[in-house]
Amino acid sequence: MTLHVKAAGIAFAAAVALPMSAGAAELRMMTGPQGGSWIPIGGQLKDIWEKAIPGSKFQVFPGGGVANVRGIQEGKAEVGLANSISTADAMTGRAPFNKPHTDVCNIASLYPQYFQFVVLADAKINKISDLKGKSLTTQQRGNTGEVITRHFIEAHGLKYSDMKVSFVGYTDSVNQMKDGHAVAFGLNTQAPAGAIMDLQAARDIKFFEQTDIYKEMLKLNPSYQMITLPKGTYPKQDKDLQVIGFFTHVVASCKLPENDVYTMTKSIAANTATLATVARDVAKLKPPAMAADIGVKFHPGAAKYYKEVGITVKTN
């Protein structure tokens, strides 16, 4: 199944009067690794929510798709950004989670994420099996991008032990590729990814299409989808690429007050233009896309907002 993801509709007006919170507090929000898109998105959400909920304060921390879900479940954070495939795994306790994570609720989907796997053009890597004995760089262990990179390698019949692997942030991965200490880079992010643009400015790279191993990837995580990375997303990309995809979404502790989460959800819909300054795919986001069923229960506060705009979502 190939799904060509397109953002729906037009942006909501940014200025909307929102109800005051009855429970203003200091909340911890987990975002992404240094050099990625989630940290600036988290900064925008912080500003939006602090204005929408008088007296509130949000602390923004780095994190990752898997770590953020665990952090909320373990009480280390109240809000975070996450990837739909990882959160769906957490709901059932599927690896890398060791038990069902029942205190994590969905607020809103934001935009599609693309798994991108690139190699240095002069590294003579024509198929993934050519990576045996070579160097690969990806995100820290447990990060969603690292998990998908491992699945991608395993779907091709290899293991990390077949190569030298660095588990670092995007910035370090790019530097390793630039200086030749790594010849392959696996990451998931919105597109175009700043890390790949940075790398491409210094080195010629080659993208790997992923249709040939999609069935094998589904065996490792049934939530994976095939989505289209449109031609022209990157310089010298002259054709559409089919890649593994999923959605970035906002999650929160199910224990957060309903009214606060209602306000947070409504303020996302009201400020898509602001969020689009750091995540362009959010520019055309509308409530139906925010409320997409990704296999994760919604917070009652989010459900309250969606009901207000004529959308029914699952809260259990």
List PLM regions with ranges:
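Bacterial N-terminal signal peptides that target proteins for export
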Residues: M1-I10
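Ligand-binding clefts/hinges and TM-proximal coupling segments of bilobed small-molecule sensing domains
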Residues: T138-H151, Y224-I294
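An extracytoplasmic/periplasmic, membrane-proximal ligand-sensing/linker region
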Residues: V168, D172, K178-D179, T189-F207, ...
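Pocket-lining segment of extracytoplasmic ligand-binding domains
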Residues: S84-S86, G93-A95, A123, K159-L256
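Acidic, polar ligand-binding/catalytic clefts
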Residues: V79-Y111, Q190-A193
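Cleavable N-terminal signal peptides
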Residues: A11-F12, A22
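Bilobed "Venus flytrap"/periplasmic-binding protein-like clamshell domains
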Residues: L27-A52, S56-Q59, Q113-D179, A273, ...
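Sec/Tat signal peptide C-region and signal peptidase I cleavage site
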Residues: L18-A24
